[in-house]
């Protein structure tokens, strides 16, 4: 694996490398789009659609939908910004990176509200309040941990790289940790999604738990997980290959040297 991502280990010519990048990029968009499409079909067709807190059972359906849209697809797109737009000015890429992560944060918060409302406002068949205890499953424990880590990553990244005035040496010191934790959180998101899909299927899909057969609902949920994993793999291949890493433009190199010299003289 270390050899695969060694920038000095070159098998493909530059034109072949660019072609491979584009192929994996297209595959990532197809897999990510299918994951979003299928989770929407799963929740709208097989799980009775969407509503807000007037119908907690339907409000829950926003949870997996928004998590796939935000924490999987938009998170992955945010990671890809510096690869897809590696020949654009850094200010453009950085702004788009922050916008996408901010959208992820919004989707994440709405998804969390949906699942907590579902638990807290749950009613029994007679219509009486029957709250479900929060945070008891392994999925919820790991999911909450991922949410906290993501929020911390967002705050640290925003202050360090988007908020003006942070010294360049500090940015350089934080960067490898920022990149590493971003990738790790993204991987754990995919794992958490798989756990959530399995948990929901075990509770709600009676075709295989009681009838012992595959059904469209179960197949749809399983394909959501498959395409989530495939999207994750494609994003990681694109992000971890140093050959596709964004390189500073000539004008940015000059500005960096001027800024560094000014900092040293101070």
Curated annotation (Swiss-Prot):
Topological domains on the Vesicular side lie at 44-61, 117-141, 198-219
TM ranges: 23-43, 62-82, 96-116, 142-162, 177-197, 220-240
| List of residues binding heme b 1 | 63, 134-137, 139, 199
Residues in the Cytoplasmic compartment per record: 1-22, 83-95, 163-176, 241-266
| Tagged with keyword Kinase | no
Output the Pfam families linked to this UniProt entry. Cytochrom_B561
Q: Give me the residues that bind heme b 2, please.
A: 83, 90, 97, 178, 245
What does the cofactor field's note say?
Answer: Binds 2 heme b groups non-covalently.
Annotated PANTHER family: CYTOCHROME B561-RELATED, LD36721P
Explain the purpose of this protein.
Answer: Putative transmembrane reductase that uses ascorbate as an electron donor in the cytoplasm and transfers electrons across membranes to reduce monodehydro-L-ascorbate radical in the lumen of secretory vesicles.
Q: What is this protein called?
A: Putative transmembrane ascorbate-dependent reductase CYB561 homolog
Q: Which organism is it from?
A: Caenorhabditis elegans
């Amino acid at each position: 694996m270390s050899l695969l991502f060694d920038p000095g280990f070159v098998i493909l010519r530059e034109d072949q490398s660019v072609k491979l990048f584009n192929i994996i990029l297209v595959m990532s968009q197809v897999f990510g789009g299918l994951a979003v499409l299928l989770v929407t079909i799963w929740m709208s067709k097989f799980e009775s659609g969407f509503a807000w807190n007037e119908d907690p059972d339907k409000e829950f359906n926003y949870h997996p939908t928004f998590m796939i849209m935000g924490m999987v697809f938009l998170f992955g797109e945010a990671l890809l910004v510096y690869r897809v737009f590696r020949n654009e000015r850094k200010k453009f890429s950085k702004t788009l990176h922050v916008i996408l992560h901010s959208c992820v944060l919004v989707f994440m918060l709405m998804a969390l509200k949906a699942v907590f409302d579902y638990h807290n406002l749950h009613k029994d068949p007679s219509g009486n309040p029957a709250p479900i205890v929060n945070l008891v499953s392994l999925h919820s424990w790991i999911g909450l941990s991922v949410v906290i880590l993501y929020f911390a990553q967002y705050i640290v990244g925003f202050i360090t790289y988007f908020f003006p005035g942070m010294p360049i040496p500090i940015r350089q010191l934080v960067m490898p940790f920022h990149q590493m934790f971003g990738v790790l959180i993204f991987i754990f998101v995919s794992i958490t999604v798989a756990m959530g899909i399995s948990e929901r299927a075990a509770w709600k899909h009676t075709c295989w738990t009681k009838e012992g057969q595959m059904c469209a609902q179960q197949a749809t949920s399983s394909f959501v997980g498959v395409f989530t994993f495939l999207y994750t793999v494609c994003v990681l291949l694109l992000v971890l290959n140093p050959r596709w890493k964004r390189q500073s433009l000539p004008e940015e190199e000059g500005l960096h040297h001027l800024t560094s010299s000014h900092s040293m003289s101070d």
